[in-house]
Curated annotation (Swiss-Prot):
Gene Ontology biological process: cellulose catabolic process
Family: Belongs to the polysaccharide monooxygenase AA9 family.
Protein name per Swiss-Prot or TrEMBL: AA9 family lytic polysaccharide monooxygenase A
Enzyme class, UniProt record, top EC level: oxidoreductase
One annotated GO molecular function: cellulase activity
Originating gene: eglD
Domain notes: Has a modular structure: an endo-beta-1,4-glucanase catalytic module at the N-terminus, a linker rich in serines and threonines, and a C-terminal carbohydrate-binding module (CBM). The CBM domain is essential for binding to and subsequent oxidative degradation of polysaccharide substrate.
Tree of life domain: Eukaryota
Applications reported: Lignocellulose is the most abundant polymeric composite on Earth and is a recalcitrant but promising renewable substrate for industrial biotechnology applications. Together with cellobiose dehydrogenases (CDHs) an enzymatic system capable of oxidative cellulose cleavage is formed, which increases the efficiency of cellulases and put LPMOs at focus of biofuel research.
Entries under Pfam families matching the protein: AA9, CBM_1
C-alpha cells in the first residue's frame, strides 16, 4: 500500500461525494429478481434518503431512518436459498455508479428475528468482507465491480420471520472520530423451512460499535498492511453460543469480481445436499449476476451451477471459523479466486456467505439545470445545477457536498 496513492484518493474523495450515497433497492432469490423492494408496497424498510448514518449510538443504526416501520411485504425463503442484495445510488439503470470508488470499506450482513431485531437486539453476523492485501482491494471495490450485488446463503434456522441487514462502512473520512459512514437497510424475510440451528443471542445495534473501534476510526490514506473488520465473529451456522466481538476473517473471491458471466456454484447448509440454483425457482439464465455462494454451515461439497449472461457475477464472502485476527484475507484469496471458474465448487467453512456493495446511479444533472432527488446541488468546486426538482430541497452535508433530499 503506497501512502501517495491514498493521498491522491483523499483529494479525489471530496470531488466524488456526489456518488457517495447508496441504499439497498432490490433482492434476488436463487437468481430470480424479486423486483424493487424500496417502494411503498415493497419488502425493504427503506429510509427517506440515501444518506449515511454517522452516529454509532443512534437508533438509526438498527435499520436506518424509519427502520422501525415494517415494510408492506415479506419475502419467503428456505434454508440453502441464495439471497442477493442489490445496492444503488439512485436507480437500477446501467449508468448507476453504486458507490463512489473513494468510499473504501467493509461490507457485512447481519440477521435477527424480526421482533427482536426491530428493537435493536439479537443481531448475528452471517457474512463479512474487508481488505485484501494481495490484490489491494476493499470489499466496496469488489461490490462496485459486481454491479452492486453480493450474496448470502440462508442458514438452517427455525421457521419464522427474520430481518436481514446488509451494511457498508465507508472509511473515506474514517481518519477522524465520527467520520465513518454507515449504510444499511433491513429486508424482511419469512423462513419457511424449519431448521434446528437457533441463532445465537447476538449483539445489540446500536451498541456493537463505538466511534473509536480500530476498524471504524481507521485512516485509509496512510500505509497499512491489514484491516480489523468491526463487530462480532461471523456465526458458524450451527453453534448456539453468544455472538460476541472477537477476531475473525472472511475470504472473498476477487476473481468473481471480474465482469465475467461464467457459471458459478452454490453450496447449501448441512441439512441439504445442494441448492439447485438452476431449477425453476432460480431461472437458469438471468438478466443479472448469478451469485457465488458459500453455505451457512459445512456441507458435503454438493454444488449446483448457474449460468449468467449479462452482469458480473456477485461476489460471495466465504466465511470461516476464526482464530486469527480479522485482517487481510490473503490466506484464502488464491483458493477463492478459483470460485469464479465456470461450474466450480465452493465449500463453505462453517459460516454464511454474503455480500457486495450497491450500484449507485451517476450524479449527472437532469435536463433544464435542475438536479434530481439524491443528486448533487452545491458545494466547493460544484459546477452543476443548484436547484432541486419539485419535492426536494438542497441540503448541505459538508462544505464539499450539497444534496437534493426529500422535502420534510
Amino acid at each position: 500500500m503506497k501512502t501517495t496513492t491514498y493521498s491522491l484518493l483523499a483529494l479525489a474523495a471530496a470531488s466524488k461525494l456526489a456518488s457517495a450515497h447508496t441504499t439497498v433497492q432490490a433482492v434476488w432469490i436463487n437468481g430470480e429478481d424479486q423486483g424493487l423492494g424500496n417502494t411503498d408496497d415493497g419488502y425493504i424498510r427503506s429510509p427517506p434518503s440515501n444518506s449515511p448514518v454517522t452516529d454509532v449510538t443512534s437508533t438509526d443504526m438498527t435499520c436506518n431512518v424509519n427502520g422501525d416501520q415494517a415494510a408492506s411485504k415479506t419475502l419467503s425463503v428456505k434454508a440453502g436459498d441464495v439471497v442477493t442484495f442489490e445496492w444503488h445510488h439512485s436507480d437500477r439503470s446501467d449508468s448507476d455508479d453504486i458507490i463512489a470508488s473513494s468510499h473504501k470499506g467493509p461490507v457485512q450482513v447481519y440477521m435477527a428475528p424480526t421482533a427482536k431485531g426491530s428493537n435493536g437486539n439479537n443481531w448475528v453476523k452471517i457474512a463479512e468482507d474487508g481488505y485484501h492485501k494481495s490484490s489491494d482491494e476493499w470489499a466496496t471495490d469488489i461490490l462496485i465491480a459486481n454491479k452492486g450485488k453480493h450474496n448470502i446463503t440462508v442458514p438452517d434456522v427455525p421457521a419464522g420471520n427474520y430481518l436481514f441487514r446488509p451494511e457498508i462502512i465507508a472509511l473515506h473520512e474514517g481518519n477522524r472520530e465520527g467520520g465513518a459512514q454507515f449504510y444499511m437497510e433491513c429486508v424482511q424475510f419469512k423462513v419457511t423451512s424449519d431448521g434446528s440451528n437457533e441463532l445465537p443471542s447476538g449483539v445489540s445495534i446500536p451498541g456493537v460499535y463505538t466511534a473509536t473501534d480500530p476498524g471504524i476510526l481507521f485512516d485509509i490514506y496512510n500505509s497499512f498492511d491489514s484491516y480489523p473488520i468491526p463487530g462480532p465473529d461471523v456465526w458458524d451456522g450451527s453453534s448456539s453460543g453468544s455472538s460476541s466481538s472477537g477476531s475473525s476473517s472472511a475470504a472473498v473471491s476477487s476473481a468473481a469480481a471480474a465482469a465475467t458471466t461464467s457459471a458459478v456454484a452454490a453450496t447449501t447448509p448441512a441439512t441439504q445436499a445442494a441448492v439447485e440454483v438452476s431449477s425453476s425457482a432460480a431461472a437458469a439464465t438471468t438478466e443479472a449476476a448469478a451469485p457465488v455462494v458459500s453455505s451457512a454451515a459445512p456441507v458435503q461439497q454438493a454444488t449446483s451451477a448457474v449460468t449468467s449472461q449479462a452482469q458480473a457475477a456477485p461476489t460471495t464472502f466465504a466465511t470461516s471459523s476464526k482464530k486469527s485476527s480479522k485482517t487481510a484475507c490473503k490466506n484464502k484469496t488464491k483458493s477463492n479466486s478459483q470460485v469464479a471458474a465456470a461450474t466450480s465448487s465452493v465449500v463453505a467453512p462453517a459460516a454464511t456467505s454474503s455480500v457486495v456493495p450497491v450500484v449507485s446511479a451517476s450524479a449527472s444533472a437532469s435536463a433544464g439545470g435542475v438536479a434530481k432527488q439524491y443528486e448533487r446541488c452545491g458545494g466547493i468546486n460544484h459546477t452543476g445545477p443548484t436547484t432541486c426538482e419539485s419535492g426536494s430541497v438542497c441540503k448541505k452535508w459538508n462544505p464539499y457536498y450539497y444534496q437534493c433530499v426529500a422535502s420534510q
